[in-house]
């Protein structure tokens, strides 16, 4: 049936990005990576979720290094809801993946999920098979100062990053309030 439920226009606007952070249980990170390589990535694509980047922390405590971080692109915030609903109800996911013993009890805590709105600061995600180091930066400013931060980033920061050999991969604002009023996320 067609979806005729009235919604706020904002939830149909897009694209939106979703930053997800998984904390793997001890001795389970390898199995989590295998699940993504063998099943999850393909099922994301099947359900209209576009993987933008996957990475692992290189520093921090042993627990912090067991995190698995990724970004998905969705056509809209509402589409993200629909995509996740279809994904979690997919018979291949429920019976073909989650029932395998090697893929059970992979996480030590509930996944973190932050929706992000793109901004007009250049950034690219060129596909590369070369190992790379990425830096995820979250900048929080006083309420009302986010446009100033964006302007400074666009006019100065990006140029300086490129001058010093850093490659901006993307910049986003938090989608949901209250963070959307003062938070910018950047991937270098």
Label each region the model flagged:
Residues 1-95, 101-188:
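Short S/T/G/P-rich N-terminal loop/turn motif that feeds into the first structured element of a domain
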